[in-house]
């Protein structure tokens, strides 16, 4: 027999990430129960489920917009959960609370994440409608052209060397 069990890693993109997160609502304890070593979730659609799952995994996860944000020195213990979410991805940022609450990605001081329009401000109802319309164009991609924007993560998927370092 084998001396060591193989490592089990989860990978999910968009709705695939959402489904996996729904299956393990308790975060680490569910990962342990299922024998999962680590997870990489890409472009998880927003909403209350996403907010609560980020909260459950906050002490053991890192959220990045692109691979260049991966720290040279990883924290100890190494994060088990990685979220790759573009700052300007409306699919990730859209949620019902936009109707009535200013999102963290649109702070009053005017700072913006990459690809969040500089002139965008939060207005009750308006920002919700704008983000809703933006979701319709978030996957408007050109074949063969990998861009690091919207809900197109092809240019930002980590290569094997990076994945081995992270997970």
Per-range role (PLM):
Residues 17-29:
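Short glycine-enriched nucleophile-adjacent loop
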Residues 10-17:
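Gly/Ala-rich beta-loop-alpha elbow adjacent to hydrolase catalytic centers
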Residues 1-6, 26-167:
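C-terminal His-loop and adjacent cap/lid subdomain of alpha/beta-hydrolase
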